[in-house]
Amino acid sequence: RTSRGLGDVYKRQLFNISKQSVNPGKNFGPYGLPKTALLSLCKQYAVDYGSLGIRSNGVNADRIRSGLLNDGMIKSRAKAREISTDEYMKGNLLTKEVKAEDVAKAFFHLAVSKKTTGAVLTVDGGNIAASLR
């Protein structure tokens, strides 16, 4: 009953998921676990509410500068990998830093894709370790 009532709340929602849900990284379990649950919930809501016209999609992004991934965290993660901060932020197949604008475009794409549900759009420049399999 509770999740059925949530359908009205989620009619206009998109979920944000991160690569943590697929590739948590060492010592990041407590951070990644809720994201893994959100990935499953996104898929479950697509199954439960698709017949009501409610769409549930996610964006799987990686290494986006934010309140959590700030300059200090970037320096720390780069140092742990013995690379520069620039190499860390561009550490993907395209060797391009993924920006918040790139993620926003993914959300917009899903928002206007009226016949898409249960999808997870990856915006990470190509992080094979975090790809959905």
Residues of each region from the PLM?
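Single conserved hydrophobic/aromatic residue that forms the stacking wall/gate
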Residues: 1-10
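Conserved catalytic-site region of short-chain dehydrogenase/reductase
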Residues: 21-24, 129
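Active-site helix of classical SDR
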Residues: 34, 42
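C-terminal substrate-recognition "lid" of short-chain dehydrogenase/reductases
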Residues: 96-123, 128
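A glycine/serine/threonine-rich, flexible loop-to-helix segment
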Residues: 51, 64-91
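Active-site loop immediately N-terminal to the catalytic Tyr-X3-Lys motif
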Residues: 23-29, 51, 95
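Alpha-helical segment proximal to the catalytic Tyr-Lys
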Residues: 47-48
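Structural signature of the Rossmann-like NAD(P)-dependent dehydrogenase/reductase core
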Residues: 11-18, 55-60, 117, 122-124
